[in-house]
Amino acid sequence: MQQMDKEIAYMTYVRHRIKDDVLLMQKAAQMIDVYEKDCVEQIYVLYKEGGKLLQEAGRLKKIEEFLYQSPEVQHIYLIPQKELEQGRFTICNGWSVKDMHMEKYSMTENEYTVRYRQKPSIMGIVKIPATLEELSGYEEETLKQLMIGRHLQYMKEHHMCINGDIIGVIVSKAVENGKPVMYLLMSVPIVSDVEQNIV
């Protein structure tokens, strides 16, 4: 009976996940504008910072755990806020697991994992080239506009500031006009200008 309850709970979860994925695909197809929503709390481990591969033994072991223990692991792009503040658009890559799945799949945090807290964010689907060769051909400012340009415009219009690292989750890959592309759900954590000034 207990096993049956577990299976029912998991099937219910899968149903909700599929429903969420379908909504994301519909948004990607329509390229619906950005919207405000709290991001999902997740734990990630990076394998690349800018052009530098991160290869510490403990980090590689944790990446292996993420990839092989969680069927719901997500490939992410991360843009650190501190890099943006220095005028750089540095893209980091990693693997992420939703907070709720860490215990479910007996996974642990360590010095190589980072907790990405739930907070108010501006979200939107963006399309970028799927190959590193093509991505590396873009100027930083062009890439910034491609990935978060609509987010920044919305923030400007609504008097908001960036309030943390920006995260993008790959939601789908496709070939369009003979070229591989990726659709990412980009989340930019925000705070109002007024709140920022108080802090």
What are these regions (language model features)?
Residues 2-199:
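A solvent-exposed interaction/effector surface
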